[in-house]
Amino acid sequence: MATRRSRCGGKMEVLEQRQRAGHASRDATGTDRIRTTASLLPPPRLDYRAISENITSKSLNALNRKSRLPHDAVASVARNYIEWKRILSELNSKRNERSVAGETIKRNASGPERDAAIALASLLKVHVKELEATLDIAEQKCLLAALSLPNDTHPNAPLGPESAAVTLSTHGPQPLPADSKRDHVAIADHFDLLDLRSGSSVAGTSWYFLRNEAALLELALTNYAMSIAIDHGFTPVTTPDVVKSDIAVRCGFQPRDDATPPVSHMYHILKTNTSSPELILAGTAEIPLAGTFSNKVYSSINMPLKVVGLGHAFRAEAGARSADTRGLYRVHQFTKIELFAVTTEDTSESMMEDILSVQKYILEGLDIPLRVLDMPTEELGASAYRKYDIEAWMPGRGSWGEVSSLSNCTDYQSRRLHIRYRPQGADAVETPLARLPFAHTLNGTAAAIPRLIVALLENGAIFDDNGSVVGLRLPRVLKPFWIGGKKRNIVCWDDGSD
């Protein structure tokens, strides 16, 4: 879907050009690498005009998504944008008058006309300075209000809460009946696969140690998912677990909510230097992956750009112990393989379907019951234009559980991270950087390891005639990635081997 670009123009565009002037270079891949004098990114470049011209639809969109907005946020953008344009018009007028006064001074070496022009120029200089300061304030008011707004929503996204999700497809074998004997914690305890007690002693509730075959299963799942992503054209990347909180916010993640007092959803690293940027543990590899593309301009001929990141996800909100947080289902840290793509604005929807096909290929190979859901408006968060979830049946829990997610964020992240592209064509070559279109970004889970382990243990447990668990049947696709672990002989591959 093509997204209309901002036509704010004027000082905002001049500011962006000034930040970049003389600081762009092109690498061997044809990427314009933009160097700024400060380590921080330029302010987000949001489309105030589009917001101002669509107050009703933008307000309804926020309402449908249950976004918690400041009072009158959408209308505030429109009011401040109108004021910004008025001030800019007056500022340009005063600048023109000052220019005329300057020409008069140049033409007259002396005399009353020159003296009057000098006096007028001095007065206009003060007016221009005052108007520039007022314009900056109006810009900041526009930005502050606009940053609170969520992305637009795909017209086919279901309206409502999580229960309104639409099942798009089902895959894999028929779901087994719900059975408490298949609880993954009980199975893991029996085979010494999971050490929650030590995790609690060492780090606290919702931390864990994987042991024996469970540790090997994590390695096998990781390499299996990475290998398929690479086969589908994704470039492998290992990501840092630490990111600047500014990058997370620009991606649509809020390190702290607006409760009183604020509740942190991410782990914050204590500053040792007050001048250092705030650092957090990444909630997903999506954040550092998106950051690698920030403040760059790509040639559309080299797009889409596709990477698969191996990282750890840290979640501070694992929550109180309950059936929903039992064992490995909701934890504070887990290994996660993340698919990330940067596309042109007219190809992101087709890329979403391409990524979904990769996710289904990975998960269908595990031979577990799956369903793909089109998620409703209240589940989209701030950044997603459309979101698919893939859930696996977990008979021990007696319910479906999310094992993968996929979001098309359109230009929500790229406008905040300054990810642009240069379209092909004769006129595009001469297009100034500030007028180039923003790219679209997409992210999807290739493998969230603990949830997959839950699904594999609960669906693959083997019981004897007395109802005692005696082994684990694992999918054959993992066998090439399995290392060691043959001493106990509890794993049976679904190709009949052990």
Regions found by a protein language model. Name each.
Residues 44, 70, 86, 171-498:
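TRNA-recognition modules of translation machinery and tRNA-sensing kinases, especially anticodon-binding
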